[in-house]
Structures are given as structure tokens and as C-alpha cells.
């Protein structure tokens, strides 16, 4: 019965530019993923619709097309696995780099989406990979290396204006975490102010980017906050204060964004060595009892700021708080133990 209605839709109702065609193709592929007879035809139909819509390069469809590609990627892996075809990272890469019907030289935005799909799946495999044996650890290291290589290729082969919003965010975030974080700024700026010269296409691109604007603001701030240029760090601090003000005045504030902005203020003011500002920003983070994600680091940075202000007792309380509450979090408990011992020695020799 499902197959009957599925076939009738493609015969009578399918139209180029229809969001329903993308949605139905994705839903059908998911529905048939355990069906030996229907999974491959459903996959081919999904490929055809993705390519048809992607070749039009319509910015109004970009976000929906990205979602369709992401859906295709997950279901393609799950369906092949259900049918006993386990695809390794190289098989996935070959499939998406040579996607049926795509001209990688001409269909730049669609090609970038497909590249990003490979990266996302490889990252997911890396994150889930076990590390119990030497062989497993070697496999995980190989996946990590492949992710880095794929990002290098993505940056090399595409201009910022070629890239759809999700890809801009992911590549920007990756670059923001490297030794040259400011390389990421162009990717975030493309979301905040697209370089598209045609006003109609630019408006459509801006509308498509809107759901990623906050990611771009925070990503750009992180990149600037890691700069060695104090003026750029000051810009990052202002960006986070502006975001906090915006959320605080909103009738429906984004609590996650507020926590992230407050945490970034602690980090950026610490990088700026503005110790009173670090203490104040950390106090505000700690005042909100729902803010827990980065609390150990906030406590540590505030403890360092107290040390710089020669407030040794307050610094000790922070370091002891970390060692007492977050023993298992070695990233912060280990330096907190050393800082605690050093602070005790300083206090006792004064």
C-alpha cells in the first residue's frame, strides 16, 4: 500500500522545486531501509531529487537541501548496514565525492554539501570509536587524521561563497580550533553578511542563513578571542556582551546562548589579563545554578585571577572546590591540585 502511494506521487504530483518531493524521498528511504527490494530504488530516487534540486542552485532551497543530504547520508549508512553491506570511511568518501549526477566543477554548492556529509559521518565514527585495544586506538587515530584531511580539502576546493550555511559553520568551527583561528572568520562573515552580489539572491541567502546567525556570532567571537591582538580580543568581548544584552531583553531568551556567552566572557577577559573583569564574569556565571557545562574551567580561571590580585584565600577556595568536586575531571583537577599547593606555599611564606 505504501509503495502504491509512493509510486503515484512520483507519477502525478512531483514537481521541480517542491519541498514535498525532497521530504517524501527522504521519508521513503527511511521507511524502506530494511526492505531488500525497495531500499536501493528509494536511494536512487532520493539521489535524483537531491541532484535535480541542487543543480538549480536556488538559495531559497539551500537549507532544506542540506537537511535532505544529511538525512540521505544517515539513512544510506543505516540501510546498507541493515542489508549486510558495511561501508567503511573510504567507501563513504568515494560515494559522496562521486555522487551520481553531480558535476563537482559546476555544482559547487551541492558538491560542498556532499563533502560535508562525509565529514559529519566520519566525525561521528571517530567520536563513537572504541579505544580498548591498540588496534582500535590506531583506527580512531586514522579517523581523526581523515577528518582533518577532509576539512583541508574542503577549504582548498571551495570559496566561501560556494558553501551552504551548515558547511560554513562546521568548517568555521573547525578552523577556529586550529593554530590559526582567524582563518575561520571569513566563513562566519559569509553567514553574517553573504558576499552574493545579486540583491535578490543575497536576500534569499540571508534568509537561509538566519538559523545559523548565532552560531556564526559565537564562532567569530571564539576566533577573535584566541587572537594575540588585544584589539581583536576586545571585539570578541563586546560581541559576547552584546549577545547577552540581546538575550536578557528577549521575551524568550536562549539560555544555552546566555551560558555560552557568559563562559566566553570569562575566557576572553582572562586572555586579556583583565583580572577584575574575569572575577566579575565568573561570579555572574556561578550565580546561575543552571550553568554547569564549563563550571570547572570557570572556577579555575577565576582562581587564577584571584592569584593575580593577590587574594590567596579566595584562590584557594576555588582550587579546593575543583579538587573536591571534580576529581575525575583530570583536565582541571590536576592543574587545580598544583595551583592549590603553590598557593598554600605562597600564603605560608608571606
Set out the residue ranges of the language-model regions.
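Acidic, polar-rich low-complexity tracts and alpha-helical solenoid repeat scaffolds
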Residues: 1-350
